[in-house]
Amino acid sequence: MAEKRNIFLVGPMGAGKSTIGRQLAQQLNMEFFDSDQEIERRTGADVGWVFDVEGEEGFRDREEKIINELTEKQGIVLATGGGSVKSRETRNRLSARGVVVYLETTIEKQLARTQRDKKRPLLQVESPPREVLEALADERNPLYDEIADVTIRTDDQSAKVVANQIINMLEKS
């Protein structure tokens, strides 16, 4: 990879976007950003609070602006929020400004990885988490597929192994 292309990680919550993104950025000596963490840094509040106060629409507006700004940078790895792909503008920007890697995982792995995480506003509802994750997958998986340049299944692999797979795929392209 002679020139450093932006790498944008998309996929459902619990797929490993943040963990794998940090590993990937470290291995490639690139700057890492996480859109949810960037929202928290700028608002001084956690994502759950932003959701509670501004609703999902307010949160998505913030997310779209931050992703637009971050994708204008060069040589970054960006872990996006699972729902960021709901915005056509965001999908277009991700596709146009870098390589989009879809980190795919099963509902079972998502449940295992998110069960104790209270920072997931869409899971802090009365519906059973499995039903919520299945509904989100039905809505979002086609959008991830639509913009993915590369798709990698993360189920039983370490962040380092997945990062190496991404690097190998990028070197071939």
UniProtKB/Swiss-Prot annotation:
ATP binds at residues 14-19, 120, 157. It is found in: Cytoplasm. The keyword rRNA-binding does not apply. InterPro entries: P-loop_NTPase, Shikimate/glucono_kinase, Shikimate_kinase/TSH1, Shikimate_kinase_CS. GO terms for biological process: amino acid biosynthetic process; aromatic amino acid family biosynthetic process; chorismate biosynthetic process. SUPFAM superfamilies: P-loop containing nucleoside triphosphate hydrolases. Mg(2+) binds at residue 18. It catalyses: shikimate + ATP = 3-phosphoshikimate + ADP + H(+). Pathway: Metabolic intermediate biosynthesis; chorismate biosynthesis; chorismate from D-erythrose 4-phosphate and phosphoenolpyruvate: step 5/7. Pfam families: SKI. Gene3D superfamilies: P-loop containing nucleotide triphosphate hydrolases. CDD domains: SK. Keywords: Amino-acid biosynthesis, Aromatic amino acid biosynthesis, ATP-binding, Cytoplasm, Kinase, Magnesium, Metal-binding, Nucleotide-binding, Transferase. Its cofactor is Mg(2+). Binds 1 Mg(2+) ion per subunit. It is an enzyme of class 2 (transferase). GO terms for cellular component: cytosol. Its EC number is 2.7.1.71. One of its GO terms (molecular function) is shikimate kinase activity. Substrate binds at residues 36, 60, 82, 140. HAMAP family: Shikimate_kinase. Catalyzes the specific phosphorylation of the 3-hydroxyl group of shikimic acid using ATP as a cosubstrate. Monomer. Belongs to the shikimate kinase family. This is Shikimate kinase 1.
